């Protein structure tokens, strides 16, 4: 993380000790976030973005399957009037294994970051960029033990 303060929460206690909160429930969040950064459930991702845009002062970033850019319903609901400032495509596949970390995992699924700028720097257009390969460069011996 490159922020001065990172606060995590979750909807259920998975043993990490995070404060519990249903992010999608109306009302005040547990804290005033500058950024909301999440990998939401695919079917609820638009809800997470809309809620994030309500509460964040800096921006919202969601990691979702790249096909999330498709769909007339999502376009009408979100992209038409609230397009992201950036769509950042991972050029290598990002394997995600439920409940654990497996450095040997592979996937056929492509992922992108969709990023909204709430702070006012955004000019209204959506920029597309590529995230270069980094998995091998960033991997460290011991990662599997730390995150398994």
Spans of features found by a protein language model:
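Class I S-adenosyl-L-methionine-dependent methyltransferase catalytic core
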Residues: 1-148
């Amino acid at each position: 993380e490159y922020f001065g303060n990172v606060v995590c929460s979750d909807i259920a206690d998975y043993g990490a000790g995070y404060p519990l909160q249903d992010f999608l429930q109306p009302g005040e969040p547990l804290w005033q976030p500058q950024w909301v950064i999440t990998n939401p459930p695919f079917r609820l991702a638009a809800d997470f973005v809309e809620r994030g845009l309500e509460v964040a002062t800096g921006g919202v970033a969601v990691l979702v399957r790249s096909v999330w850019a498709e769909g007339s319903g999502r376009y009408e609901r979100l992209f038409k009037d609230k397009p992201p400032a950036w769509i950042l495509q991972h050029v290598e596949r990002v394997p995600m294994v439920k409940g654990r970390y497996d450095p040997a995992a592979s996937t056929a699924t492509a992922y992108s970051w969709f990023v909204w700028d709430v702070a006012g720097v955004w000019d209204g257009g959506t920029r597309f960029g590529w995230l270069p390969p980094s998995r091998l460069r960033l991997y460290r011996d011991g990662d599997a033990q730390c995150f398994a």
